Amino acid sequence: MIAAAASMSALGLGLGYLLGAAARKFHVETPPIVEEIAKILPGTNCGACGFPGCNGLAEAMAEGNAPVTACTPGGRDVALALAEIVTVEAGADAGPIAEIEPMVAFVFEDHCTGCQKCFKRCPTDAIVGGAKQIHTVVMDACIGCDACIEVCPTEAIVSRVKPKTLKTWYWDKPQPGLVAASAETAA
């Protein structure tokens, strides 16, 4: 018994040392811009952008192969933050950032069979429900990646515009020329 425990411990320590040495030897340095972009992205790795996770999108943006608006779950705020980094440091053209309406999944409960394929596929656990029971989406947790829509066998899930609440609604900042012109006409 003691010999088995000692041999397993020695084997574990030896393999751990080999893994640590291999990690140091084969370490690949990532550019700092990729790390900056990855910090801004939501980190849900949903794949809605078409890249394998948020790090894949960050690498593509750093190389100039992906637009700053590729991350749909991040929305307008993430696109604006990425535009500042990518255009200044990578020299990529950000282009105009269109107003992206945040989307959420919606389940038609009369079509849902409770197969749980959407439940298993959701990266943020925004879908609730049990086996052979009707599922529903928690709108505050849904990021709009559409991963659940792809796997639904009965097409009971659709993507809808997220309803505006006091948390999500905002006014655009007024343009400086318009404010000055309206002040002059008022006087």
UniProtKB/Swiss-Prot annotation:
Binding site for [4Fe-4S] cluster 2: C112, C115, C118, C152
Record's note on what induces expression: Expression is reduced under iron-limiting conditions.
Protein name: Ion-translocating oxidoreductase complex subunit B
GO molecular function terms noted in the UniProt entry: 4 iron, 4 sulfur cluster binding; electron transfer activity; metal ion binding
Enzyme class: translocase
Upper classification of the organism: Bacteria, Pseudomonadati, Pseudomonadota, Alphaproteobacteria, Rhodobacterales
Key words, A-Z: 4Fe-4S, Electron transport, Iron, Iron-sulfur, Membrane, Metal-binding, Nitrogen fixation, Repeat, Translocase, Transport
GO BP terms in the entry: electron transport chain; nitrogen fixation
Membrane association type: Peripheral membrane protein
GO cellular component terms attached to this protein's record: plasma membrane; plasma membrane-derived chromatophore membrane
Cofactor binding note: Binds 3 [4Fe-4S] clusters.
Family to which the UniProt record says this protein belongs: Belongs to the 4Fe4S bacterial-type ferredoxin family. RnfB subfamily.
UniProt binding sites for [4Fe-4S] cluster 3: C122, C142, C145, C148
UniProt KW Iron keyword: yes
Stored Gene3D superfamilies: 3.30.70.20, Electron transport complex subunit B, putative Fe-S cluster
Entries under PANTHER family matching the protein: ION-TRANSLOCATING OXIDOREDUCTASE COMPLEX SUBUNIT B (PTHR43560:SF1)
Protein task: Part of a membrane-bound complex that couples electron transfer with translocation of ions across the membrane. Required for nitrogen fixation. Involved in electron transfer to nitrogenase.
Membrane-spanning residues: none
UniProt organism field: Rhodobacter capsulatus
Subunit composition and interactions: The complex is composed of six subunits: RnfA, RnfB, RnfC, RnfD, RnfE and RnfG.
The enzyme's E.C. designation: 7.-.-.-
Predominant place of localization: membrane
Cellular location(s): Cellular chromatophore membrane
Region feature (Hydrophobic): 1-23
Cofactor: [4Fe-4S] cluster
Annotated binding of [4Fe-4S] cluster 1, by residue: C46, C49, C54, C71
Pfam families: Fer4_21, FeS
